[in-house]
Amino acid sequence: MEGGGRGPNQTILSEIEHMPEAPRQRISHHRRARSETFFSGESIDDLLLFDPSDIDFSSLDFLNAPPPPQQSQQQPQASPMSVDSEETSSNGVVPPNSLPPKPEARFGRHVRSFSVDSDFFDDLGVTEEKFIATSSGEKKKGNHHHSRSNSMDGEMSSASFNIESILASVSGKDSGKKNMGMGGDRLAELALLDPKRAKRILANRQSAARSKERKIRYTGELERKVQTLQNEATTLSAQVTMLQRGTSELNTENKHLKMRLQALEQQAELRDALNEALRDELNRLKVVAGEIPQGNGNSYNRAQFSSQQSAMNQFGNKTNQQMSTNGQPSLPSYMDFTKRG
């Protein structure tokens, strides 16, 4: 039991002794890949005016770098350290395979990967196969470099994007016009450098054109509706004017009818008053006629009665003439009333 307890401690101590005193320092620093800053926002204007013919490929260090040595034999894989293994618990000796191998220092610089921006170098006519040279001066294919990955950047002739269609759409629609801050020539150059961005710009332009067409159609429909409403308002205003004229005419006629009615009422009142006056006079005459005693055959009495009767007839004729001159209908004379009485 004691030997099994000391085994793991001895293993840990032996690992600590084999550890280096200071961490390994890399001689060469890591170069930042051009694919990370190739299409930055600050230098996009310079990239659009980029001329591939100005590149000096002889000055590139990754083309003249010697190939790394190839390992002929594979290193034996280190067996994982097990604290609870039977060998360490029983013997207390650390097996040689359980020690981690020392890291080997690697001398060399980071080579830029062609997988991220290989489309750009394909347009320039530069591939990694042409610039991998051996010591004898012969050019041959290197097997130790990173191969191009179609999953990251795709081919230029893939179905997702077609530069020819972009160039045709640019030359057909937007030639001579500047939309979204970029002309057709610069967009064509951008299509060669960054196809995805050019495709996105074209999609935005098409979407803006469609929205503009929808806006124009909607504005035209609104204008037609406004014109229709204006015509209806004009027709209704004419009808309202006609109705107002009819109403004013009816009001005038109503006033005339009211005036005629008032005149008729006044005439009726005058007739009633005249009838009352005649009736009172008739009653008075009846009373007077009843109070006169009958004569004894004297001619004086008859002459007096005839003179009174002629005076009454003259009074009735005068009243009839006055009524006819005023436009009132003629009324029966007092003689008629006396005869009827």
From Swiss-Prot:
Belongs to the bZIP family. Residues 1-33, 59-106, 135-156, 307-341 are annotated as: Disordered. SMART domains: BRLZ. GO terms for biological process: cellular response to sulfate starvation; defense response; DNA-mediated transformation; import into nucleus; negative regulation of cell differentiation; osmosensory signaling pathway; response to osmotic stress; thigmotropism. Pfam families: bZIP_1 (PF00170). One of its GO terms (molecular function) is transcription cis-regulatory region binding. The modification Phosphoserine is found at S79. Residues 163-341 are annotated as: Involved in homomultimerization and histone H2A binding. GO terms for cellular component: cytosol; nucleus. Mostly expressed in dividing cells, present in leaves, roots and seedlings. Transcription activator that binds specifically to the VIP1 response elements (VREs) DNA sequence 5'-ACNGCT-3' found in some stress genes (e.g. TRX8 and MYB44), when phosphorylated/activated by MPK3. Required for Agrobacterium VirE2 nuclear import and tumorigenicity. Promotes transient expression of T-DNA in early stages by interacting with VirE2 in complex with the T-DNA and facilitating its translocation to the nucleus, and mediates stable genetic transformation by Agrobacterium by binding H2A histone. Prevents cell differentiation and shoot formation. Forms homomultimers. Interacts with Agrobacterium tumefaciens VirE2 and mediates its translocation to the host nucleus. Binds to VIP2. Forms a complex made of Agrobacterium VirE2, VIP1, VIP2 and single-stranded DNA (ssDNA). The interaction with KAP1 mediates its nuclear import. Binds to the H2A histone RAT5. Interacts with MPK3 and Agrobacterium virF. Forms a complex made of VIP1, VBF and Agrobacterium virE2. Interacts with SCF(VBF) E3 ubiquitin ligase complex. Binds directly to VBF. Forms heterodimers with BZIP34 and BZIP61. This is Transcription factor VIP1. Phosphorylated by MPK3. This phosphorylation promotes nuclear localization. Induction: Transcriptionally activated during the acquisition of pluripotentiality (in protoplasts) by pericentromeric chromatin decondensation and DNA demethylation. Targeted to degradation by the proteasome by VBF and Agrobacterium virF in SCF(VBF) and SCF(virF) E3 ubiquitin ligase complexes after mediating T-DNA translocation to the nucleus. The gene is VIP1. It comes from the Eukaryota. Residues 307-331 have a biased composition (Polar residues). Residues 196-217 are annotated as: Basic motif. It comes from Arabidopsis thaliana (Mouse-ear cress).
